[in-house]
Regions:
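Flavin-dependent oxidoreductase catalytic cores
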Residues: 1-136
């Protein structure tokens, strides 16, 4: 794996943390996968890449990829698999996610269903980034 070469070089150059994600610019669905994606359909679908980076560093790692379930996210943080959870579509679906989790209102969360209809679809159609849950 090239990670064994590049991660230590980046640490030596002064990198203090890693935000691990995936991008395939020939396929937007691989970069922002819908729930029915053949390889990336599960909660935390990119965390396996964090595990690979972890093999080469003890620096903090931010994970991303279909994170929406508060219990799942907490487990990843508590076990040290990741030091930070990054969310994009989930925060479009419910910008109050962090506040609802902190207040113990997890049942009130609008969970991202990863349909990509208004977030990615709106972006591709130059209509802005929105969510199917938005009112109005």
């Amino acid at each position: 794996s090239e990670l064994g070469i590049f991660v230590p070089m980046l640490v030596e150059a002064g990198v203090t943390s890693f935000h691990v994600t995936l991008a395939n610019h020939s396929s937007l669905e691989d970069t922002i996968p819908p729930r029915n994606h053949p390889y990336f359909k599960d909660e935390g679908c990119f965390l396996k890449f964090c595990d690979e980076v972890r093999r080469y560093t003890d620096k903090p790692i931010t994970g991303v990829g279909g994170l929406s379930d508060p219990d799942f996210v907490e487990e990843q943080l508590a076990t040290g698999r990741i030091a930070c959870a990054a969310m994009c579509r989930q925060l479009l679906a419910d910008p109050e996610w962090p506040n609802k989790v902190a207040a113990g209102q997890c049942k009130e969360i609008h969970r991202c269903v990863r349909c990509n209809k208004k977030c990615l679809g709106g972006l591709q159609q130059h209509q802005g980034t929105h969510c199917i849950y938005e009112k109005g």
